[in-house]
Amino acid sequence: MTRSKPNKNTKKYLKHNKGFYGRKKNCLKLAKQYYIKSLFKKYIDKKNKKRLILKKKIALINFFSRIYFGLSYSKFVYILKINNCKLNKNIILFLLLKTIV
């Protein structure tokens, strides 16, 4: 009876850690630890990337609304809210860019 399951798991970790430096790439115990750590960092970085993109969108909306309407971002969003305009930041930015060009 061949034992393929443990070898499959070993290959999974070692295949993922191919570009790592030192024992992280070929020592199974360390490979597992750094595999889990890399997945956790990947999750955190995805969240940070979304946060950064949102900050940039808000900064652009603020920039264009100050130049063309003379309003800050918060006042611009407040006016939209008063007029029951339920648009997300992507659409607002798209519309501002379209009106400029």
From Swiss-Prot:
InterPro entries: Ribosomal_bL20, Ribosomal_protein_bL20_C. GO terms for cellular component: ribonucleoprotein complex; ribosome. Keywords: Ribonucleoprotein, Ribosomal protein, RNA-binding, rRNA-binding. One of its GO terms (biological process) is translation. GO terms for molecular function: rRNA binding; structural constituent of ribosome. It comes from the Bacteria. Binds directly to 23S ribosomal RNA and is necessary for the in vitro assembly process of the 50S ribosomal subunit. It is not involved in the protein synthesizing functions of that subunit. Belongs to the bacterial ribosomal protein bL20 family. This is Large ribosomal subunit protein bL20. It comes from Carsonella ruddii (strain PV).
